[in-house]
Amino acid sequence: MSESQSASRDALRRARRVVVKIGSALLTNDGRGLDADAIGEWVDQIAALHARGIEVVLVSSGAVAEGMARLGWVTRPSAVHELQAAAAVGQSGLSQCYEEHFARHGLRSAQVLLTHDDLSNRKRYLNARSALRSLVALRVVPVINENDTVVTDEIRFGDNDTLGALVANLLEADALVLLTDQEGLFDADPRHDPEARLIAEGRADDPALAAVAGDGGALGRGGMATKVRAARLAARSGALTAIASGRQPEVLTRLMQGETLGTLLMPDHAPLAARKRWLAGQLQVRGTLVLDAGAVKVLREHGSSLLPVGVRRVEGEFKRGDMLVCVDEQGQRIAKGLVNYGSDEARRIMGQPSRRIEELLGYMESPELIHRDNLVIV
């Protein structure tokens, strides 16, 4: 192990607050309901970390698979309402299974179901953060899942890897651990290339990592591509991300002891401020602003506000306060932010200096299209 790798593993060993995401393949009997013994083993490891003073927040799949088993379904349905029904049936069983196993160690667990709306609304985001912080302070293990019963495709997180990263941001966790049925991230698909090598360590923002990521399996929605994106998102709050196989014995406790297992992705930059993390975590955007080269340069180099003069084109229909994405003229994402004007007004003032806003609109809400406090570089 190199000196830098040793330092990175030591950083994981020193982590005091960890978000652990366990995929459905590691919690179920190949989709035929929950594997209670496997869940018991995960709880044993989490309890061992608690005994070391490590705060653990668990993001757990398994509700849909449990619901499918209880309903007698063999294959995962494609209809959204059937998936929602399965989640509703299975969630209580999942929660009860965790509760019984944590009780063996004198620990309490709490079921927390979140939707993207909970984290996109600033007030609800802060409320969720306060509630989770209180649970952790009480030495209760939060067991978090997406509220599949009420969520729609348009506002879903998409997978529990992304949810885990957003929870890591929410709680300012030191680390995000993504446990899967694969050893980690490889430089090629190990199922088809016998020469594929495990990537022991990398940088979360390395664009080359996305090229070697694959798709998810039959039971879950998350493949390696989602795990790389999750690592990039978690890095915004300074969290490192470990991706490892949940098939290895005692993998969680061994990882947290600094053992070289799986892939470790380190953050590239200093942590974003809390409000910027919230902005960065917004998955739903209402429109797009296409920027000229000058505006791109100013945003990237100085983190300045976005003025109308730097906007070449406005796409989509939106209202004041909506989340927009800013792209360069080649379509590359530059930033996201909350806009000060609706789409009609934005089209009338784009490309114009701020001093002309009142002349063009009859009023001036703000000299900026997006203020720097409401803007995050992506």
From Swiss-Prot:
Disulfide pattern: none
A biological process from GO: L-proline biosynthetic process
InterPro entries given in the database record: AceGlu_kinase-like_sf, Asp/Glu/Uridylate_kinase, G5K_ProB, Glu/AcGlu_kinase, Glu_5kinase, Glu_5kinase/COase_Synthase, Glutamate_5-kinase_CS, PUA
Record-annotated PUA domain positions: 286-364
Major subcellular site: cytoplasm
Reactions mediated catalytically: L-glutamate + ATP = L-glutamyl 5-phosphate + ADP
Molecular function as annotated in GO: ATP binding; glutamate 5-kinase activity; RNA binding
Pfam families: AA_kinase, PUA
Intracellular or extracellular location(s): Cytoplasm
Keyword terms of this UniProt record: Amino-acid biosynthesis, ATP-binding, Cytoplasm, Kinase, Nucleotide-binding, Proline biosynthesis, Transferase
EC number(s) from the headed UniProt entry: 2.7.2.11
Pathway field: Amino-acid biosynthesis; L-proline biosynthesis; L-glutamate 5-semialdehyde from L-glutamate: step 1/2
Binding positions (substrate): S61, D148, N160
CDD domains (UniProt xref): AAK_G5K_ProB, PUA_G5K
Function: Catalyzes the transfer of a phosphate group to glutamate to form L-glutamate 5-phosphate.
Stored PANTHER family: GLUTAMATE 5-KINASE, ISOPENTENYL PHOSPHATE KINASE
Name of the protein in its database record: Glutamate 5-kinase
The species this protein was found in: Chromohalobacter salexigens (strain ATCC BAA-138 / DSM 3043 / CIP 106854 / NCIMB 13768 / 1H11)
